[in-house]
Curated annotation (Swiss-Prot):
This is N-acetyl-gamma-glutamyl-phosphate reductase. Belongs to the NAGSA dehydrogenase family. Type 1 subfamily. The gene is argC. Its EC number is 1.2.1.38. The keyword Oxidoreductase applies. It comes from Escherichia coli (strain K12). The keyword Magnesium does not apply. One of its GO terms (molecular function) is NADP+ binding. It catalyses: N-acetyl-L-glutamate 5-semialdehyde + phosphate + NADP(+) = N-acetyl-L-glutamyl 5-phosphate + NADPH + H(+). Disulfide bonds: none annotated. Keywords: Amino-acid biosynthesis, Arginine biosynthesis, Cytoplasm, NADP, Oxidoreductase.
Length: 334
């Protein structure tokens, strides 16, 4: 049994982690924590997230020193802000824990990336070298030996799952950069109240045009330039990405289908559509990424959907933990 600590459990992704870890037959929740300054400190997780009432009624404990919580802990999930994860991960690693970080603090092995896109100076370049990028379907072997796993961002997960097999198979003409138009539900912005996310203000709108930090994450791990435009949707959760690409001359729809099938035939959390394209409602609340596509001449449109809090965060983190510790990949997820 893996003793498991969830840090930042009060947020949306944190609550989903609580759900998955609680029902995992090989994990035991030792504590749920929030920052010492959090207004949620001392509250029950089930008071903040009533879907957990009668299932997990543990208190959210304030954490100011990891030594209060790290003894005897095998696994730590960090559902915390980037700067917080940056500071906490090394301490938990030093304490002998395996760390799964849902923030962006260790996703890209380039310290200058964090100054430019995250606004802080990275102090642990050696951990950037050591961290395994947790795109579970593609990086499984690296995960098995890693003690620090950087869980990919929500947008990059869907984008890479859709594009990586096609790029690796050399089917795309990358002189025309893939264009990724992605829309996410409001939960992607977290639980903290903001006027722009309030019911009467939220509207379908692009944001972070040419500046969003997920663009370089996607491009770095794909090894290909992309144009990425995120949009805020007026719905609670889920991500839908419409990706436009150019195929190399002579590449057929059958070849695209074959490459995707070969990539994901034995990957249970990626579902391929033989016909048509996926709808968001079919993945919300589920740990899958659904992918469909259409071809017209040399033009390819791929549609990928996922729940941003699940396959885009908590479910993928648990999927990575299952791979790391040798459990069935879908344990506690489906």
């Amino acid at each position: 049994m893996l003793n498991t600590l969830i840090v930042g459990a009060s947020g949306y992704a944190g609550a989903e982690l609580v759900t998955y870890v609680n029902r995992h037959p090989h994990m035991n929740i030792t504590a749920l924590t929030v920052s010492a300054q959090s207004n949620d400190a001392g509250k029950l997780i089930s008071d903040l997230h009533p879907q957990l009432k009668g299932i997990v009624d543990l208190p959210l404990q304030p954490m100011s020193d990891i030594s209060e919580f790290s003894p005897g802990v095998d696994v730590v999930f960090l559902a915390t802000a980037h700067e917080v994860s940056h500071d906490l991960a090394p301490q938990f690693l030093e304490a002998g824990c395996v760390v799964f970080d849902l923030s962006g603090a260790f996703r890209v092995n380039d310290a200058t990336f964090y100054e430019k896109y995250y606004g802080f100076t990275h102090q642990y370049p050696e951990l950037l070298e050591q961290a395994a990028y947790g795109l579970a379907e593609w990086c499984g072997n690296k995960l098995k030996e890693a003690n620090l796993i950087a869980v990919p961002g929500c947008y990059p997960t869907a984008a890479q799952l859709a594009l990586k097999p096609l790029i690796d198979a050399d089917l795309l003409d990358l002189n025309q950069w893939p264009v990724i138009n992605a829309t996410s539900g409001v939960s992607g912005a977290g639980r903290k109240a903001a006027i722009s996310n309030s019911f009467c203000e939220v509207s379908l709108q692009p944001y972070g045009v040419f500046t969003h930090r997920h663009q370089p994450e996607i491009a770095t791990h794909l090894g290909a330039d992309v144009i990425f435009t995120p949009h805020l949707g007026n719905f609670p959760r889920g991500i839908l990405e419409t990706i436009t690409c150019r195929l190399k001359s002579g590449v057929t729809q059958a070849q695209v289908a074959q490459v995707l099938q070969q990539a994901y035939a034995h990957k249970p959390l990626v579902r391929l559509y033989d016909k048509g394209v996926p709808a968001l409602k079919n993945v919300v609340g589920l740990p899958f990424c659904d992918i469909g596509f259409a071809v017209q001449g040399e033009h390819l449109i791929i549609v990928a959907t996922e729940d941003n809090l699940l396959k885009g965060a908590a479910a993928q983190a648990v999927q990575c933990a299952n791979i790391r510790f040798g459990y069935a990949e879908t344990q506690s997820l489906i």
